[in-house]
């Protein structure tokens, strides 16, 4: 893989998601787990450590491809602060394009910018 062009990547920094109180939608199962299985959060540390195996931020340094990352700053499903935790750990060539007024939705012309980036291959 030489080029990578994620748009609002998912599964970044689960702990940050919890701190932002965004345990709904895709993360609703987390709230359910704590409510039904661990109401005092006695096993919270272990819970997030296990999720670390699939957390993008923990694998970002292994990505060798050139990355063109795009995100909407109003995204509540994949919050930018959680995405930044992965983006900042990328060690190769990278570029980020931010869309201040957009959330987790179709952003005009993003397909064009991705295709322009991928033409480098």
Task: Report the location of each language-model feature.
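Short, conserved loop/helix-junction motifs that constitute active-site signature segments
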Residues: 61-63, 90-91
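Generic beta-strand/beta-sheet core signal
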Residues: 7, 70-72, 99
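Short beta-strand/loop motif that positions the catalytic acidic residue
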Residues: 63, 69-71, 75
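Hydrolase active-site cap/lid region
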Residues: 1-42, 106
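Active-site nucleophile elbow and catalytic-triad environment of alpha/beta-hydrolase enzymes
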Residues: 42-59
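Histidine-bearing beta->alpha loop at or near hydrolase active sites
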Residues: 93-117
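Acidic catalytic loop of the alpha/beta-hydrolase fold
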Residues: 73-78, 104
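Short alpha-helix in the alpha/beta-hydrolase fold that links the catalytic acid
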Residues: 65-67, 79-88
